[in-house]
Amino acid sequence: GNTINIQDSTVTAAISAGVGTSGEANNTVSISGKSVLNNAVIFGGMFHKTGNTLQMHTSGVTAGDIANFENLHFYLPNNIANGDTVLTLDGQAFGTPTDITGANIGVAVTGGKAALQPGDRITLINAELGLTADAKPVNNTSGMKGIQGVSLRYGFDLSTDPNNLYATVNKVETNPQAKTFSEGRAGGLAFINQGADLISEAGIA
């Protein structure tokens, strides 16, 4: 599959990670930084969506529409706040509601601690001409990269209304993987310090 990285960029035309007409696509479009995508339609592939992934590493982005993505992964930055919107779609290119039916949706916070509390709600997608989605979307972070080592882990409930896809924080907990790493690092430092003390006592230092 192909990968397109859009970082701190301005794009006004269509963006397509692939144009194949058969087989699995497995393309990735990654958006980060202060990207301006007004009127741009973002395609995982022109004809197929199998394996295609949209990665959102930022918030406050406006685009024309998205199409042909099997996976929608939202990596919320640590400056995300209650009430923020990640992706706004004006829908003008197609003139129809945005369709994300059947998409695997994953939401996680990356980087440092975010100022989110249980009950806070983030709008992942605001589709101005309407949103067609599964009745009960579920947060599935399988396949999301770079979220295992963060110190806090946020749980999200997903919900929709006729124009929006929401993620509401349902829990905030310490990541046991990050705790294990921290304890291992502290143990290593203690071992180094102990070794230095033994060397000093032996008159070697």
Q: Where in the sequence are the language-model features?
A:
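Extracellular beta-strand/loop-rich repeat segments of large surface/secreted proteins
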Residues: 20-121
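A detector of tandem-repeat and repeat-rich interaction/domain scaffolds
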Residues: 1-7, 13, 27, 31
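Per-repeat structural element of leucine-rich repeats
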Residues: 13-14, 39
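Well-ordered, non-membrane alpha-helical segments in soluble/globular domains
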Residues: 3, 28, 83-93, 132, ...
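Outer-membrane translocation/initiation segment of Type V secreted surface proteins
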Residues: 111-205
